[in-house]
Each structure stands twice: as structure tokens, then as C-alpha cells.
Amino acid sequence: MTRRLRSTDPSLHRVCSVCRLLGVSKQAYYKHEDRSLFRLGLERFVVEFVREIRALDPGIGGNKLWHMYRQRFGERYSVGYNRFYDIIEQYGLKVRRRSRRARTTDSRHGLPLYPDLTREFVPSSPCRLVASDITYLPLNGSSRFCFLSLVTDCYSREIVGYSVGESLETRYPLEALEMALRRYEGEDLSRLIHHSDRGLQYASFAYTDLLKKHGVRISMTERGNPKDNAIAERVNGTIKNELLRGKSFQSVSEAREAVAKAVDFYNNMRPHWSIDGMTPVQASKCDGEISKRWTSYRDMAIKRAMADAGGAAALMQPAAAGCISASIQPI
């Protein structure tokens, strides 16, 4: 109100006169002006932060952005959850999902299959369970695709192996698996379960022989339900629809470069609700149960079943002290 009165003709409305008219002090007026300027500056600060993160992760959602904002700036530039969302919406920074599909799994083969070992298993430390899957990345200006193979640690959610190929040949999932095995060098791989769908690549002799050579137990989905390999499916979606959102690739080599940057950001900077807001690399330093910021009814059912069988203590060990503050280290 005061600002509107002054803007009509500043020569006619000095601050003192306007304040007397409205029954407020000059100090209150200038304090209000300072607060307004601070709010405007804070709004621009939030927008620049969101744009900075979106340059690295174009599809990251508002919840994680707000979590990262609070982690980085704390109370110095505090913005409430609702205000943060209002700013994102006001500046057109909300994201919308889109879909385009290519077939990546072909289970119509005569190769040996393996049982699902994960139905009643919850990993209690890294290098106990990994999930592998293949997704597609469209190439610009054509109906062609390249294919991303990922291997994810189901405890820490760290992507421990990846490869981008121009076809669905087994060599590319093998490259991702070899990277994962190097990541686990020195670990007891006889405790590790490798879980995947029943696709030709994962059932191939080249792939299963490499797993057996390192003593890794093989697990496969027993139905066509994506939920049977949910973690791998979720990570695929995060990389493709969030971190690579809106990006177009002229070639496979260009896609490989973008994927390398996306995986680095995902592992080292992006918070994950399934590991209590930590990054995957932070969680890889932990041991024992990590709190989730959502309810996993599957984990609850498994724990109840194990408790009834007297095996809960063997399934879940106490969390290591200080794991939440583990420092971020590059892989």
C-alpha cells in the first residue's frame, strides 16, 4: 500500500507523510521494504539453484531438489516446502513425464533359467545383492535406439556397472558386469546374488559363466512382472527419464558421455529416499539396516516372516555408527 501511494507521484508523497497517513513508523516501513527485497532475492536464489541442479539432472523432482537445497544452505537461506514448490511452479520449472518404448527383453530362448533367490531376502550390507537390467535411449532424428545396461547394488543403490551399446548384444551387459566385479574387487563374492530378468543376454552362457567363475549366485525373475526386478527398473527410469531428460544424442558415443556424467551425479550427489536421504556412495560406506523415508511393505513382510522363523537377527544387523555422515568419495 505504501509503495503504491509513493509510486503515483513520489514528489507528493514523502515517506514521513505516507507513514503518518497509514499509521506506521518509518522504521516499520523500511523494515518491510528490506523484508520484501530479501524475499525477492531469496526467490531468485532458489531459481538459480534449481537451474544449476537441473543442468546436471533435468528430470529431478521437487522433493529431492528441496532436500538438496536444505542440505547445501541449511538455515542461512531458509525456504519452506510449500514456498519452494510455489517458486518452482511460478517459474515453469516443474517437469512432466513422457514415454517412448523399445523392446529390450526377449525371454523366448532355450537357455537354462535360474530360480528367484530374492523373494525373501533383504540385503544388510553392500555386495550382497545386485540387480541388472537393460533400457533404451533414443537417438536424435531417427527411430534408432542405443541400449543402456546397468548393474545396481540393492543395498546402497549405487550403480556399480554400466555400458552403452548400439545393439542388444550380450557384450554390453557383460561390460557392465565386468565393471561391477572390478568395483567389488577384494570382496567375498560368494555372498553376492546377481538378480535379473530372463532375457537372452542374462541367460547366455557367456554371462552366466562369468558369474559362476567368480562364485556369484544367479537369480532370475520367475514371471513377467517388472516388480520382480523393481530396483533395477527404478534406477533405469531415474537415469533415462530424470538425469537424461530432454537430452538428445546424435551418436552412441555422445550418449556414452552423457551416461557417464549422469551416473557420476546419481552416485555422488543425488539423495535417495530408500537410503535415508543419503547418496549411494555415502550408503556404500554403511553396514546394517538403513532407514527408508517411505514404507516398504515388502521389507516389513519379509522381516515378520523371518522373525516368526527366528531368523530376523541373521537377516538384519544393527546399523554402523556414524554411517549417515559418511563422506562422499568418487568411485
Positions of predicted regions on the chain:
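Short, amphipathic alpha-helical "recognition" segments used to contact nucleic acids or chromatin
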Residues: 1-12, 47, 51-56
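Mobile genetic element proteins and their domesticated derivatives, centered on retroelements
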Residues: 18-19, 29, 50, 65, ...
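Basic, flexible linker segments flanking DNA-binding modules
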Residues: 19, 26-126, 225, 281-293
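Conserved, non-catalytic sequence blocks in retroelement Pol enzymes and Pol-derived host proteins
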Residues: 59, 73-76, 122-124, 139-141, ...
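Mobile-element integrase/transposase regions
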Residues: 81-150, 175, 179, 183-184, ...
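RNase H-like two-metal-ion nuclease catalytic core shared by retroviral integrases
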Residues: 104-107, 196-198, 204-209, 218-240, ...
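A short acidic/small-residue loop/turn micro-motif
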Residues: 153-154, 164-171
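C-terminal domain-tail junction helix/linker
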Residues: 212-216, 238-331
